[in-house]
Amino acid sequence: LLKSLHKDERVIILEDVHEVTVDHVVEAVYMMYGDAGKIGRVSATDALRACMRLTPGRIIMTELRDDAAWDYLKALNTGHPGGVMSTHANSARDAFNRIGLLIKATPIGRMLDMSDIMRMLYSTIDVVVHMEKRKIKEIYFDPEYKMQCVNGSL
């Protein structure tokens, strides 16, 4: 997926451990995050806020977890053409459940109905690639279901 990024896109990469390279992209900004409170570290949420000030074309985030799940979903819904993120899940479809539970655990997520969170996820995320040991195991892509979520026909 990352190799398909156009060389002239503004790409912001948010990582807790450096794993991602996009050498073919001219304007790539790397931001490191970690456990907030440690000297020299900012939280993933702080990194996302800083990222949004840079007018990203694409936002790549590794290890989506904690409160950052809600912030990342909001970032993807602000008119950017897309993003790539990683999280731990048991399958491609289970990634939606995992992210949904992460969002539900946030202060804002606790006020939202889980079905609304899931509808937002399915209407925002186009493709999920499930990998094990750096090999593709499964790909989720269901544009018809996405359109049902977008149109509210579920």
PLM segments and residue spans:
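Conserved P-loop NTPase
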Residues: 119-154
